Regions:
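Proteins enriched for Cys/Gly/acidic motifs involved in redox and nucleic-acid/cofactor modification
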Residues: 1-169, 175
Length: 177
């Protein structure tokens, strides 16, 4: 099985996509590059601007049109921040937020086995544990990323991140060292 990832947005998304690639590779998938054939197409979306939302939808629409039998996945900040809108995007076979990333593989397996469309977006809860997503190597970057937190508690009027992440979740400092 081949899986292709498309990542929009910040370095956090790049890091999370790297972790997902590693997870899929460890479970027998081959990573396909943009333009190559694949059985699964996953967009890790950004919602800092509505342009990011639009690019995510456009990419998945194109992949679904070009590969009607493939599984398409919309994940990331866009479905987390706007779950009702993202759930209505029917070109995605799996719509999930930025919570339980490791469940993406399990849900993709269900879809490959013939399961119906899955929408799995859960709001973040206060006290929720930071999700460990280790990345052993970065294919396209010369520098590694160390993810230390998700979200922000600042509540700036112009920023959507607190809508997407709700509560700040931080990595234990000593485990970073």
């Amino acid at each position: 099985m081949r899986v292709c990832f498309y990542t929009l947005g910040c370095k956090v998304n790049l890091n999370e996509t790297g972790a997902l690639e590693q997870l899929f590779r460890a479970n027998g998938f081959t990573i396909a590059q943009e333009g190559e054939a694949a059985d699964v197409f996953i967009v890790n979306s950004c919602t800092v601007t509505n342009f990011g939302d639009q690019k995510s939808r456009k990419w998945l629409r194109r992949k679904k049109r070009e590969n009607p039998g493939a599984v398409t996945v919309l994940t990331g900040c866009y479905p987390q921040a706007f779950p009702e809108e993202a759930a209505q995007f029917m070109e995605a076979d799996l719509v999930c937020g930025n919570g339980d990333r490791k469940a993406i593989l399990e849900n993709v397996q269900k879809l490959l086995d013939g399961h119906e469309r899955i929408v799995a977006i859960a709001p973040h809860q206060r006290g929720e544990q930071f999700e460990e997503l280790p990345v052993e190597r970065f294919e396209t970057h010369t520098r590694a990323f160390i993810k230390v937190e998700d979200g922000c508690n600042r509540q700036c009027a112009y920023c959507v991140i607190p809508v997407s992440y709700t509560h700040l979740r931080a990595h234990e400092t000593r485990s970073n060292l």
